[in-house]
Regions:
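Primarily recognizes the serine-hydrolase "nucleophile elbow" in alpha/beta-hydrolase
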Residues: 209, 216-281, 562-632
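Alpha-helix capping and helix-loop boundary segments enriched in small/acidic/polar residues
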Residues: 140-147, 184-187, 201-212, 234-245, ...
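Alpha/beta-hydrolase-fold serine-hydrolase catalytic core, especially in secreted/extracellular enzymes
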Residues: 23-110, 120-123, 300-491, 499-524, ...
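Positively charged n-region of N-terminal signal peptides that target proteins for export
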Residues: 1-6
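Cap/lid segment of the alpha/beta-hydrolase catalytic domain
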Residues: 121-215, 222-223, 262-273, 487-570, ...
Length: 692
């Protein structure tokens, strides 16, 4: 009798019906070495087509989460006391200026200058953050093309408080081991922070620290008695423009913002402080800036830099989002005929915008910049001799303190009851998705069965699965036992072999070994190709991970796609759903643990990995920025609870305490099995057959 499944291997369905193709009985061609073109900071980007308010609000939520995860700020650190010091007041015509320093994180000091209105009463006044660009002098730059002091003085004279603060490594914001850095070396030391590859495992980065500095700078302004907390704003140029729209993406306290000469569909930022891991795998600066909508925003562009297309590309794209939110009047974009700048012409455009939204001035009001005199550097410097407070941490000790913060956050998430598991999932599922750069639930565009055939009573097919447009196909081999569709509770085992010394058979061959044993127990089997087997570009070069997935992220993404396909079947009688077991052999067991939430149950060969070893997690096949912030391989495993899990070959250094605690806390200890040794194939088959 003909296998009823053969006619149904118009097989796996999720989104689009599988296409059968009458092809020769041969295996699909090997995957190409590169899955897709490598992106970098200059790769042109397109704004996605957004059709509705709801679609944008959902995407904006994803963007905010991605920014926070990439910056190592998910979950948010505790906001410890700032212990702000404001001193050295100088009074001038219509304004005062003071020196400021405070602690965004304990024993790390952020410094700047606070400009306040004089002769306008006690307030409360609007308050504006002023991050600076990569001028040689940082916040103390005062040239024709850009002057932080010029805009801060004029903001104060117009009735607004202004706070200018340093990038890390500039002027007064540094680490004691940097010494008294000369002006010429500011940028060099700025790019020195957290460049050790190990820091990527924690998403500790220059961009993350500066984003947190901006959040805490906003806290500082909000703490001042003469500040109106409902009228907070931010503006900066170039790298300071990046800080502006990054803050706007994650902080709803901003009432207005003005990123200057930075939002572009081409160049996304050329410094480490603008390129956190994973930030632009899916998103561009255009979308990150648009995440502030519907709050008032003005983009300033120049004909002489990468923002030259703002009138035809970036501006209209973001304007469409404001239109979807019925907030067209809250967005404006202008371009001036200059090079890269924040000059007087650009500043006056921002004065008008902030005057409208922060001071409620009429549209016709056009405040002009008044003549100003910047104070001498020595009178604005907070630590002019480079000597920081005695308790300031060195860079290495500060980085270790941030790692300890993440460790404490992970420990605080330990699951102790069912409510704790739910809380863990709500917090950590976004972290899991954005750390691994996966779409969840996985989407499948097309799945084709090629060369469907009968082999010794089993139905076999080579599968070609397309996840998303532009991706290379995922290739797999499939076998089904007789009567699979008449089984009231059919099971399929997805096998991924991470070893190169024992390839599993393809669909043109008679199944043997583990696949045959599974088939003889009435289980369908899908064996996945090893994905991208070529040598990728150096994943550790600056910015690579900002724009591209690592090999590990690609593999986990593919496993989730395959599991989504394997769980849904085409049957003439209607859709059928298979119970999916994901089985990872060798290093693929670790990939399977990260993909565990996409499967009904998981068997993972843990390869006796020493998870505590940074060197082990920096191996090309296991490297994933931020992986330690999701508990490495335990995080994805806990997210799948209470589904059955079998971890074997754990050895002595693979942590499972948090995982065991979670299963025990919800009364599901019987669903979890952890074995130090590697199990034999027959033991794996028995576990799959018995698990419910």
């Amino acid at each position: 009798m003909k296998n009823p499944f053969a006619s149904a291997v118009g097989l796996f369905l999720l989104v689009v019906c599988l296409e059968q193709a009458a092809l020769p009985a041969e295996s699909p061609a090997a995957l190409p070495e590169q899955r897709r073109a490598i992106k970098d900071l200059n790769t042109p980007r397109e704004f996605p087509k957004i059709a509705s308010r709801e679609a944008w609000e959902a995407r904006a939520k994803e963007i905010r989460e991605q920014v926070l995860v990439s910056c190592g700020l998910w979950p948010m650190p505790e906001k410890t006391p700032l212990q702000a010091h404001v001193f050295g007041r100088i009074e001038r015509d219509g304004y005062s200026v003071e020196k400021v320093y405070f602690q965004p994180l304990p024993r790390f000091y952020l410094a700047g200058n606070l400009y306040r209105p004089l002769g306008r009463g006690k307030g409360p006044f609007p308050a504006i953050l002023n991050p600076h660009g990569h001028w040689k002098e940082g916040r103390l730059a005062d040239t024709k093309d850009g002057s932080t002091a010029a805009r801060c003085i004029n903001f104060a004279r117009q009735g607004m408080i202004a706070f200018s603060y340093d990038m890390v490594g500039y002027n007064d914001t540094s680490f004691p081991d940097y010494g008294n850095v000369p002006i010429e070396a500011y940028y060099l030391w700025h790019r020195h922070f957290a460049t050790n590859q190990v820091n990527l495992l924690w998403n500790i980065s220059l961009m993350g620290l500066q984003t947190w500095d901006s959040v805490r700078a906003l806290d500082f302004l909000a703490s001042l008695p003469d500040v109106d907390r409902k009228r907070l704003a931010c503006t900066g140029e170039s790298g300071g423009g990046t800080q502006t729209f990054m803050l706007g993406a994650v902080e709803d306290r901003l009432a207005a913002q003005a990123p200057v000469v930075m939002v572009s569909h081409t160049m996304q930022g050329g410094c480490l402080c603008e390129n956190a891991p994973g930030l632009r795998v899916e998103y561009s600066n255009m979308e990150i800036a648009a995440a502030a909508a519907p709050r008032p925003q003005i983009l300033l562009a120049a004909t002489g830099d990468w923002t030259k297309d703002t009138l035809t590309v970036e501006g209209p794209a973001i304007e469409h989002i404001y239109q979807l939110l019925d907030a067209q009047d809250r967005f404006r974009y202008v371009r001036f005929n200059f090079g890269h700048n924040y000059n007087q012409t650009s500043r006056e455009a921002v004065y008008r915008w902030f005057g409208k939204w922060l001071l409620k001035q009429p549209d016709a009001a056009s405040p002009k910049e008044e003549p100003y005199q910047k104070e001498p550097d020595a009178d604005l410097r907070v630590f002019p001799d480079g000597k920081l407070p005695d308790d300031a941490l060195t860079e290495a000790r500060f980085v270790e303190s941030v790692k300890n913060l993440h460790r404490a956050q992970w420990e605080s998430l330990r699951v102790r009851d069912e409510a704790g598991l739910e809380g863990f999932k709500q917090l950590m599922q976004p972290a899991w998705r954005h750390t691994l750069h996966i779409e969840w639930p996985a989407r499948v565009a097309r799945c084709r069965a090629e060369g469907v055939r009968e082999i010794e009573g089993f139905t076999a097919a080579a599968l070609r699965i397309d996840a998303l447009e532009g991706d290379a196909s995922i290739l797999a081999s499939y076998w089904a036992p007789p009567g699979i569709l008449t089984n009231p509770a059919p099971k399929v085992v997805v096998i991924c072999n991470g070893r190169s010394d024992g390839p599993l058979p393809d669909a043109a061959a008679r199944p043997a070994g583990l696949p045959l044993a599974l088939l003889q127990h009435g289980l369908a089997v899908l064996v996945v190709d090893r994905f991208s087997t070529g040598v990728p570009p150096n994943q550790f070069t600056n910015f690579y991970t900002t724009y591209n997935r690592t090999k590990l992220q690609e593999r986990v993404r593919d496993l989730l796609t395959v599991c989504a396909v394997a769980g849904s079947v085409a049957d003439p009688r209607g859709p059928r759903f298979f119970d999916v077991t994901l089985l990872g052999i060798g290093p693929a067991g670790l990939w399977a643990l990260l993909a565990a939430p996409g499967s009904g149950s998981v068997i993972a060969d843990c390869d006796q990995l020493d998870v505590a070893s940074d060197e082990a997690l920096l191996a090309p096949d296991l490297f994933c920025p931020g992986i330690r912030n999701i508990g490495a391989f335990e995080g994805g495993s806990i997210l799948t609870a209470p589904h059955p899990l079998l971890l074997h070959n754990t050895g002595a250094a693979f942590p499972t305490d948090a995982l065991r605690s979670a299963y025990r806390a919800i009364g599901a200890s019987n669903k979890l099995r952890v074995v130090a040794a590697r199990l034999r194939d027959e033991e794996l088959v028995n576990w799959i057959s018995q698990v419910k």
